[in-house]
Structure formats: C-alpha cells, structure tokens
Amino acid sequence: MKLTPMMRQYFEIKENYKDCILFFRLGDFYEMFFEDAETAARELELVLTGRDCGLEKRAPMCGIPFHASNSYIGRLVAKGYKVAICEQVEDPKVAKGIVKRDVIKVITPGTYTDSSFVEETKNNYIMTIYSDLERNRCSLAITDISTGDFLATEGELEKGVILDEISKFNPKEIILLDSLDQELIKDITLTTPALISRKPIEYFEEKFEEVLNAQFGEKSNSLSLMVKKSSNALVKYILDTQKISLTNINDIEVYSLVDFMTIDLSSRRNLELTENLREKSKKGSLLWVLDKTETSMGSRMLRRWIEEPLVNKEKITLRLNAVEELFNDLSLNDSLKEALHDIYDIERILGKISNKNANAKDLIALKTSIGKIPNVKGIIENCTSSLLRNYHHNLDDLRDIYELLEKSIKEDPSLTLKDGDLIKDGFNSEIDELRLAKTNGKDWISSLENREREFTGIKSLKVGFNKVFGYYIEISKANYSSIPEGRYIRKQTLANAERFITPELKEIEEKLLGASEKLCSLEYDIFLDIRNEVENHIDRLKTTAKIIAELDCISNLAFVALENDFIKPEINEDGETKIENGRHPVVEKVIPKGEFIPNDTIINKDDNQLLIITGPNMAGKSTYMRQVAIITLMCQIGSFVPASKANISVVDKIFTRIGASDDLAGGKSTFMVEMWEVSNILKNATENSLVLLDEVGRGTSTYDGLSIAWSVIEYICKNKNLRCKTLFATHYHELTKLEGEIHGVRNYSVAVKEVDNNIIFLRKIIEGGADQSYGIEVAKLAGIPDDVINRAKEILEKLEMESSKDNLDLALKEVNASKEEMKEASITSSYEVKETLVEEDKIEIKEEVISKASEAKTHKEDDQIQLDFSAIGKDNLIKELSEVDILSLNPMEAMNRLYALVKEAKNLI
C-alpha cells in the first residue's frame, strides 16, 4: 500500500525535524501523527484517534485548534520538548493539488517568547559551548532572543569555569560540541535542568565569518577565533529555529571572566542570591529583599548585577555615588520611581518587533513608554554624580518615533492584525475613503431595517451579519405569520427564528464586504510599514531601554537602602574588611523588627586572616558567615549595606562550603561532596578571595575530620599563594589552639547564656573560642524525648570523666610541633596535586594537605590491633601503651581501650 499524498508530504517535512513534535496544519487545526501524536496525547491529555494514511493500520493522530495553540505549545516546551510549527504556505483556494506546507518556526525552551510562559523578570537564555582540546580553551555564547542580549566569553577548558557560567546564566537550553568530554557532559547534565543538544564541529566552525558578518556587521571582526565559533553556532541555531534574522540581536557583549566576581555553583546556592534553597523561589533570597524595581527591564538588570558583582573599584564607586545622590534626595527619587512605573518592557516589545509578531497594542505600549522618557530625563537633569549625568546625556527621547506612533496607531486597536481597526483617521486618505463607504453602507443597513419593520409591522425584525451567511433579516417564529408572501428568500432556520435575504440586501452586502476586505488589507499593510519603520531604529531603542533599566536599578537601590536602614560602604583594595553592626538583610526581614542581633567583623590578610568560629548549633554561626559574604557582595554591586559602618575590601571570588548535602545522581556521598567543594576552594581561591568554611570534616570519623580541618587551616594560612580571608566555623574545639600557633588565626565564638540548665542563644560574636558545643541542649530544644536527653547526659559525663584530655592536648601540641619543624620552603613551595580515591570517585586534594592530615592519623591497620596482656609484663605494657594512637580513635573506642589497659595494669600489680 502507498501513503496518501498528504501523508507523504508529512513524512518529507518530518524527516528534517526528527527531534521535534511536528504541529501539522490542516484547516483550522494542528494535527500530530504517529509517535508525535502519542507523545502529545500523553503530555497534553488529548484524545488519541486515528486517520487513514494509506498503510494497513491507521495513523495515530491527535489535534488542537490553531487559535488555541499557544497554551498547548507552552506546556510542551515547559516539559523540555521542541515544537515545529508547519503551516499552509499557500491559499487552499488557489492551490493545485495538495496545499504547500512548510515549517515556519521551531519553538524550543530557549527560544520561546510567549509572555504567558516566559517570566517577566527573568531572562530566557540559550547557551552554546565550544572547546579546543589542543589549546585547552573553551568559549561560551549566550543570548536571550526576547531581549536581544548576546554575550560571549572564553577561558580555560575547566569544569569549574563552565559550570560556574551555567549556574550564573541558568540557561533553558544548551548546545554542546558533540566531541566535548563525556564526563564534562555528564556534569553539565547533572548541574542544570536545561534542554541539552549536541552539534558536530562543523556547526561551530563552518562559515562563521559569513554568518557573523550578516548578523552583526563589522562588529564581529574584532572577536577572537574561539568566541566567533561559539557565537557562530548560536546565530545558526537562531536562524534554524526562527527562520529569520533577528534585528534586535545586533551587538555582542564580550566579557572577561575576571571582569566580575567569581561565585561558584555551590556558593550561589548557599548564599541564596536569587532563590531560596528550600523552595527554589525568589522569596527568602537576597533578590527578594533588594528588588523593588519599577520595570521588568530593571528587575532583570538587578538580577544580573547580583549574579555578576563588579571587581573594579572605580566602577563600584560610580554606582555607589549615584545611589547616594538619590538616597539623599527622597523627593527626587520618588518622582523618578513614579515616572519609571508606567514604562513597559521595551526590550521584549523590540523582541516581538524583530520576530515579526508585535501587534498594534505592543506599539501603543512602546509609544506610552517613549512618552515617559522626557519626564525621566527632566527629573535627573540637575543630578551631579557621574553615572546619572551620563544617563541624562545619553538618554534619547525618541521624539520622531513617538510622533509616528501617536498619529498612526489607534489608542485601542484590534488585537488581530488582519481584522482592521488599527490606523487612526487622517493618517491615510485611502483608508479614510474606505471607512466612509463602509459607514454609509452601515447607514443603509440601518435604514433598511427600519423600513422593513414599518412595512411588516414586526417590531422585533432585525438585520444581522455573520461570516458564514453574510447579511440577513431575522424574524422570530412568533411573527412568522406576519411575513408578506414572496417578499423574502428563506436562508436559514433556527430553533426560534427564521433568517431571510433579499436581492437588494445581497447587493449592498457585496459592496460593503468588498470595502471591508479592502480596508482590512490596507490597514494591515500600512501597519507593517509602520512596524518596519520602528524596527529601523532598533539600535536607538535598545540603548534607551538599557539606560532605563540601569536607572531603575540605581533608583531601586536608593529606595531599598532607605527602607531597610542601609548605609553607604567605603571601598578599599588593601585587603581589610571592617563591618560594624553588620546584619543579614534577608534574616532580619523575616523575623520581628528589631530582634536581629548585629555583629562586627574584622578580617584581613594579616593578624585576622582566618577566623575560627565556635559555638553550638542554632547559635547563628552560619548566618553570621553568610552575612559577611552578602554584605561584601552587596557592596560590589553598588548597593548600600546593612550595617552602621562598613569598609569593604574588594574580593575577586567568594567560595562557600556550608551545609550538608549529597549528590545521589552523581554517585557522591555527603562527605564526598564536602571534600570536592574544599578541593575546589583550595585550588581556585586567591589572596583576594573570601572563603566560608562550615564544619569541614564532619562527614567522617572524629579524628579524620579534625585532621583534615586542621591541615586545611594550615594550608590556607601558610601557603603564600593563597592566604585568603576565611571564616571557619567548627565544632572541633581543639582547633582553637591554633591561635598563636599559626599567624593570622583568630578565635571567635557565639555567646551563650546558661540559665537553670537551659541555654539562651545571644547571637553575638565575641572574641575567644567556645568551651563546649551544647549539643545535648540543642537536641533538647529540638524536642528529643527526655529519656534520650537524660541518657545522653549520663554517657557524656562518663566519657568526659574517663577521657584523657591532658594527653589529647599533649598529642595536639606534638603534632603541631612536628609541623613547625618542617622547612618553610616546603610550606611555600608550589604544591603538587595528588589524586585520591574516595568512595569510588576522584577528588583532587593538595598533597600538602594530605600529608599534614596523615601526621595526625596512622594507617588504619593499627586500629585493629588486639592487645593480649596475659603474655607480657610491665615493660611490654608500657611499650604497648606508648604505641596506642589516641588520635585514631573515636570517644567510645578510646574509653574501651583505656578500660582494657587499666584492667590489665591492675592484674600486674
């Protein structure tokens, strides 16, 4: 059997879109067949039917009305599918044979622009990644076709670099070079929910000069070869999916990875910059506190500022000075916010214009927005800060575009472009003439209706119109007997009425419909001319939109600073950060006003380089550490900060190792994840970085963990290529002995007050280490049963009585002394990387850290030694006692070993 002609056409088109669900236009429906139909029926809850296709079995089929397609497309795209829209590209009335069809657009998660599914305040990015294995380099290109943003960068081909950029932009779709390392592809897949496609090297490397010149013109000539190749693939992908060149993508913003603060994936999550950890929503994040912007453009820009803090002191100062000027003039800033409030999303309107799907209401929104610009410009006219002066100077009032739209487009135009009612009277003489003819025709229809009522005596007689039957005379069945015989021609019978026509009515109908059809067609053509004229000025419009967005951010930061009692920080590059009465901006927002306890911080590259913070759980150690990082970050985006005074040293990177989590999909345990994060920090932090380490080593045995934590502290403080500012929270109180032993280490703790065997968390950071962890008290607060609490106290008392704290102190001193005897050269020399297998996965830990940790713990086999004192005398007992490795034992093992030794010693007396 042979396929039907229509089904042959379907398969020919589907062959080129195998990775898409093909929406195949048949009349007023989009139909899907075979596997596409089965997938769509399942995902969209549609009825699966069948259609004869020429084969023995009917083709599985389902369909949706074309006029309601957007919601169905959005649901599929949200689930990670690509949808190819196949339209009839010729009029069925004039088609010879089967109607020609072709795919006019491919809609993907990264190219979908429908406002019902794309968040107003978020960019919808798509990313390409290119790699050169020989040079060990990679390049990335990123765009949001709805706004016209197009960015690119290049750097070392390292997993961390790529994953950090992915976490920063959070793209909905990623196109990879198919020869990219498989392990890296796996890591990318586990890191992001983005739809991932793979393309051959030719897709990146062929015709890049031609493609980029066509899209960007001479601007592309100065790009590096690496950037050209990733950008080439991205532009090609846009052309492949949109089927047109998008004029709003007309420039490439090439940025360097060192232009902005590096914040790795883990740190973005831990600091909850744009979404909270628990619900992945904006509420409870830093963005939630800071975002009181007036425009969608400003909100997206602020999000990007938070994701990309500045590292250039001069640029930070420019923003801070602009914020300060508006902060100091409340009336001025209120006026500015009011003027910005009525400005629509110019960037996304331009995206619609570029994509040829902007309607008349979009142009009215654009006109309204442009009309606000002179007021905005006037408000900041007398501002003195450099940034605000630049905004005023460069802000284009776009008067010519405003006047064009003001005189051409109706204030309340039709949503459907081909239905007319778009163009104002007086703009085009031919439109005015056709409207007059149409109006006269309607007057005639009204006159006819009155005349027929008088003639028949039927007061309810009316003349109506629909697209199927045209004009008609409708008479209710109750008045049917009053119709003069032979006056009307019956056209349609309804349940309660009859519809008729007359030769005279059909004659005027032809004239009216001819005028209406011609009017709609002419209005549509003129509208397209106006839209194209606006598109010719897209460069000016994009520049203006960016200034409005930045101005909104500056105004917003001034407003938020006033609302939350933030202060302007000072900036330095000396390496010392001083914060007086610092507060966590999110935490203080969610607890009753006035209850947050502020804290001071001094951290530098000298005597306060690494702060060891001890204290019980729930006391506020993690909040304090995060607050220092967030205050630093806020300063570097140009924001005022929550403190009474702050002098912030610019940092190039923020790293955090906070909280316990595993990576089951990646096959990594909690401890494995912790070690990977620590390894990443030790390899990538610099002397200008800020590092937060919380409970390093807690995922393993006590002395393993203590040894690792100790050696990490030494490595950070003694490696002359590192010495980064570090906040180190721990429950290993033994580490507090490092103050005075290692230069730069200082002890701090969270103050706790004991009242009637209960503890009160004072949330205050004070100098000196904590003397205990209060773990049982915290367990009691958490609601652990009293029986468990009481038994825990008994066990703790026995352990504390029988443990030999003095011996432990001595051991710690001896281990430290052995380290001090090491030559300084070995401390400051270049550190080699050693690969260590941990739980069947690989972690790279600096060899120096491994060797230092090993000093505090002997080989595991020693733990298994069974002492048989029945065969030895006192000398042997002393010898065996001296060989017991106390550092390798957990508290219970130490107690059992001590008990056995004491018992045997008594037998020898």
UniProtKB/Swiss-Prot annotation:
UniProt xrefs under Pfam families: MutS_I, MutS_II, MutS_III, MutS_IV, MutS_V
Cellular component GO terms held in the UniProt record: cytosol
Keywords, in A-Z order: ATP-binding, DNA damage, DNA repair, DNA-binding, Nucleotide-binding
GO MF terms, alphabetically ordered: ATP binding; ATP-dependent DNA damage sensor activity; damaged DNA binding; mismatched DNA binding
Presence of keyword DNA repair: yes
GO biological process: mismatch repair
Gene3D superfamilies for this protein: 1.10.1420.10, DNA repair protein MutS, domain I, MutS, connector domain, P-loop containing nucleotide triphosphate hydrolases
Coiled-coil segments: none
Highest taxon listed in the record's lineage: Bacteria
Keyword ATP-binding: yes
Binding site for ATP: 615-622
Purpose: This protein is involved in the repair of mismatches in DNA. It is possible that it carries out the mismatch recognition step. This protein has a weak ATPase activity.
Family: Belongs to the DNA mismatch repair MutS family.
Protein name per the record: DNA mismatch repair protein MutS
Originating organism: Clostridium perfringens (strain 13 / Type A)
Gene from which the chain derives: mutS
